[in-house]
């Protein structure tokens, strides 16, 4: 089980990461990592970076059966 400090340190070492990458690197369930990232964000230590939809080649993300699964969400330290 990872701690909040380990999540922060991993982000410091690697720059920006997705929650799934952090979960895998720390061998911790993703819901727990999501909660830790939310806590770091509320403390002003981490920032959420969301990709813009202009990366969608077809421009049909709204009608995509996967919703907006092609839009990635990254986390980085402030």
From Swiss-Prot:
It comes from the Bacteria. Iron-sulfur cluster binds at residues 56, 61, 64, 70. The keyword Repressor applies. InterPro entries: FeoC (IPR023732), Tscrpt_reg_HTH_FeoC (IPR015102), WH-like_DNA-bd_sf (IPR036388), WH_DNA-bd_sf (IPR036390). Keywords: DNA-binding, Iron, Iron-sulfur, Metal-binding, Repressor, Transcription, Transcription regulation. Pfam families: FeoC. GO terms for molecular function: DNA binding; iron ion binding; iron-sulfur cluster binding. May function as a transcriptional regulator that controls feoABC expression. This is Probable [Fe-S]-dependent transcriptional repressor. It comes from Escherichia coli O17:K52:H18 (strain UMN026 / ExPEC). The lineage of its organism: Bacteria, Pseudomonadati, Pseudomonadota, Gammaproteobacteria, Enterobacterales.
